[in-house]
A protein has these predicted regions:
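Eukaryotic helix-grip
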Residues: 2-191
Length: 191
């Protein structure tokens, strides 16, 4: 993603910023003031507990996360839901997303980037996913999660692109807002 893209703010509440550009790329950025101890963002990432923690912190938003690892690449299948029941529906706005990630650690820094599967644009690949999980998954690409810890402060910047046709801007926005909500609770967990 190009830092020179024109980003506009969707939401900047609770010290966590959600921005979007015209290419359906989203950026979530926030700082965490660590309360001390061994439970740091970097340690959670190193121990492979990120998605387990996100799921535990967001039972009303994340219905299910399945993570498989092969050759250092983590394939993540996530079902997002809205079950606040404010509109009288028991569960609605279910969105299934998937992405593949590669982790890179250096001292007090972790950079997670999306790793494209050669078969992702292949109809047979999508058919195999649907057969395996019983549902269609929307691909989220160009993911970059940069985490830097310094002096009891952690800076997190997450960028990603939704691979949904422009005509479905509402679904794009839901994914951006769901991810913001998920990572807001992640931020709260460490503070």
């Amino acid at each position: 993603m190009d830092d020179n893209d024109d980003w506009f703010t969707i939401c900047d509440e609770k010290n966590i910023m959600l921005e979007k550009n015209n290419n359906n790329e989203y950026k979530i950025s926030f700082n965490i003031n660590l309360k001390g101890g061994e439970d740091t963002v970097i340690n959670v990432l190193k121990n492979g507990q990120l998605f387990e923690l996100l799921s535990a912190l967001n039972p009303d938003v994340i219905d299910k996360i399945t993570v498989t690892e092969h050759d250092g690449v983590h394939s993540v299948f996530m079902t997002l839901k809205n079950s606040d029941q404010a509109d009288g529906e028991e569960v609605d706005k279910i969105i299934n997303v998937y992405f593949s990630l590669k982790y890179n650690f250096k001292e007090n820094k972790c950079i997670i980037t999306s790793k494209k599967n050669e078969n992702e644009n292949n109809d047979e690949y999508h058919s195999d996913i649907k057969k395996k999980y019983g549902k269609d998954f929307l691909h989220v690409s160009k993911i970059k999660i940069k985490v830097v810890e310094k002096n009891n402060k952690t800076s997190v910047c997450i960028t990603f692109k939704t691979d949904i046709q422009k005509s479905n801007n509402i679904k794009n926005m839901f994914i951006g807002l769901y991810f913001k909500k998920i990572f807001y609770r992640f931020k709260q967990y460490f503070e």
